[in-house]
Regions:
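Phosphate/pyrophosphate-binding loop motifs in nucleotide- or prenyl diphosphate-using proteins
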Residues: 1-182
Length: 182
């Protein structure tokens, strides 16, 4: 099978179900942003491979898989309903449990953190901000077509996960968090 089809050469693409839409369609923007997030999540997992972060790497690999499902759900067009499994409640519950565990182990802060101090911390914040952009794109898509609510919930939780993972990396590497002091 060839990687190119020439079907998109005139600025249109097919959604799951066969519907043809412009490549600037809000659904294409949403699933494209999730695809970008998946790539950054993989990079973050690769950067965390080692003896200090085995659980986090495992979590990130599971998140990558869920993000593929999220992207597929955002790519469903006319005739594609029911062709993609949904994001499970368990996936969101897992995120919430991971968030709670990280938060319990971290010192409380009352100021915003500024990304930096370590490449892995910065990459956590890149993932967080791309996730927020993906969530906004999914919300725009939801205004025009059907987007499963679990997609929106998952993306919302996921950005919190990346924030706390950044703080966790700082804590475990003894990197001082950079706090914003206006």
């Amino acid at each position: 099978m060839k990687i190119y089809t020439k079907g998109g050469d005139k600025g249109h693409t097919s959604l799951i179900g066969g519907e043809r839409v412009p490549k600037y369609d809000c659904r294409v923007e949403a699933y494209g942003t999730v695809d970008e997030l998946t790539a950054f999540t993989a990079l973050l997992a690769d950067k965390l491979v080692g003896d200090r972060f085995p659980k986090s790497v495992g979590q990130l690999r599971r998140i990558e898989s869920q993000l593929m499902t999220v992207a597929a759900l955002l790519a469903v067009g006319e005739g594609g309903q029911g062709k993609v499994a949904s994001v499970s409640d368990e996936a969101t519950t897992d995120l919430e449990q991971w968030i709670d565990r990280m938060q319990e182990r971290l010192p409380a802060i009352t100021k915003f953190t500024i990304p930096g101090g370590d490449e892995r911390i910065s990459l956590c914040h890149v993932c967080r901000t791309v996730c927020r952009r993906a969530e906004r794109a999914a919300l725009r898509a939801a205004e025009q077509c059907e987007v499963p609510s679990e997609v929106l919930v998952y993306l919302n939780r996921l950005s919190d996960y990346f924030y706390l993972l950044g703080r966790t990396v700082a804590d475990r590497t003894s990197t001082e968090e950079i706090l914003w002091i206006p």
